[in-house]
């Protein structure tokens, strides 16, 4: 997991997922630091709320050597699958074969802002069909297809990946069917915003069901935990930053997922009501530290390592995706200031030097 000198080396992968809300120069610098430290990948969310990940990663391609790039997640309601493939293959060429993608139906809150009635449009069936379209188009560079959601006649592209097989993984939160489909057809599953042993046992149990149904070995899949993280020597400051930021993620979490953390969604309704009324400060204040502790990985490097080692890896997760947050990001979301929290580059260094080595010798379950 780490050589002990601050460079990441492990059978358990460690990656960084950014929210591209910083200046392009600052974002590229963060990516360069992650590359130099040996992180497996730099991912980014693919949402209208943030800057464009495809342009950012194209700009970072020739400034890095080993780190992989891709959306985590991109989505198949607001984006067309073959156009995602065109972007991926172009990025793969620019990076010399370092592109991949995690694909889902999309952020439900954002789709509501687009007035997309996604729930009545068979989202998982659409995603499954999109994964078939994308795999075909990436592998063959052309497609003829007549599906329930996507149709193509004689479509082709000059955008071809460098890799023999560009990895396509699925993103999922609620389950269980999305977890099973990922086990059946995808190169992996990345599960966002869970932090409990119960949640990850549930995820992996259903990935296994899908893999078994397809005659696949689930242990060969990339099984990621996408977690909001703040790493600092000032434990209280890290936890306060995480508390503020995580409050904004809660509305995206299905009730079933909250229940796997011992949280009844009805407990959070007053907070949701405050957000809906536009009273952000009140909503954040109603999200207490005890809830934030359940729904983030924050604290000293050693505290973060302990939570990952105890609650996440034992289920069989083999990829930790750190969605790191710092003071500028907290202020952007909430308007509130926090102190005692390092910038992203310094958090990447702290994690590589102390958090990841603290997990050495504790591989994910076989």
Report the location of each language-model feature.
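Active-site-adjacent structural elements that line small-molecule/cofactor binding pockets in enzymes
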Residues: 1-366
């Amino acid at each position: 997991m780490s050589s002990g000198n601050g460079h990441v080396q492990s059978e358990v992968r460690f990656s960084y997922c950014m929210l591209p809300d910083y200046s392009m120069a600052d974002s590229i610098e963060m990516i360069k630091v992650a590359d130099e430290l040996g992180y497996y990948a730099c991912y980014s969310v693919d949402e209208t709320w943030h800057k464009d990940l495809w342009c950012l990663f194209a700009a970072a391609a020739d400034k890095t050597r080993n780190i992989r790039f891709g959306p985590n997640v991109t989505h198949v309601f607001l984006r067309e699958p073959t156009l995602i493939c065109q972007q991926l293959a172009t990025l793969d060429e620019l990076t010399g074969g370092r592109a991949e993608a995690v694909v889902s139906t999309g952020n439900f809150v954002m789709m509501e802002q687009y007035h997309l009635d996604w729930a009545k449009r068979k989202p998982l069936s659409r995603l499954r069909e999109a994964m078939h379209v994308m795999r075909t188009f990436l592998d063959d560079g052309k497609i003829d297809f007549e599906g329930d959601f996507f149709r193509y006649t004689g479509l082709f592209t000059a955008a071809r990946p460098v890799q023999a097989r560009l990895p396509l993984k699925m993103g999922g939160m609620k389950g269980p069917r999305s977890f099973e489909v990922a086990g059946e057809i995808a190169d992996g599953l990345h599960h966002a915003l869970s932090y409990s042993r119960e949640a990850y046992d549930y995820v992996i149990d259903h990935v296994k069901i899908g893999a078994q149904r397809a005659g696949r070995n689930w242990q060969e899949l990339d099984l990621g935990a996408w977690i909001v993280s703040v790493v600092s020597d000032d434990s209280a400051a890290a936890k306060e930053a995480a508390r503020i930021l995580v409050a904004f993620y809660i509305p995206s979490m299905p009730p079933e997922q909250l229940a796997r953390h011992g949280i009844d969604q009805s407990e959070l309704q007053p907070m949701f009501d405050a957000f809906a009324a536009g009273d952000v400060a009140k909503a954040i204040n109603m999200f207490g530290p005890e809830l934030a502790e359940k729904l983030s990985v924050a604290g000293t490097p050693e505290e973060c390592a302990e939570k990952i080692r105890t609650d996440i890896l034992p289920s069989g997760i083999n990829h930790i995706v750190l969605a790191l947050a710092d003071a500028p990001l907290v202020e952007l979301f909430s308007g509130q200031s926090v102190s005692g929290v390092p910038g992203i580059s310094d958090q990447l260094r702290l994690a590589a030097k102390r958090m990841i080595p603290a997990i050495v010798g504790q591989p994910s379950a076989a």
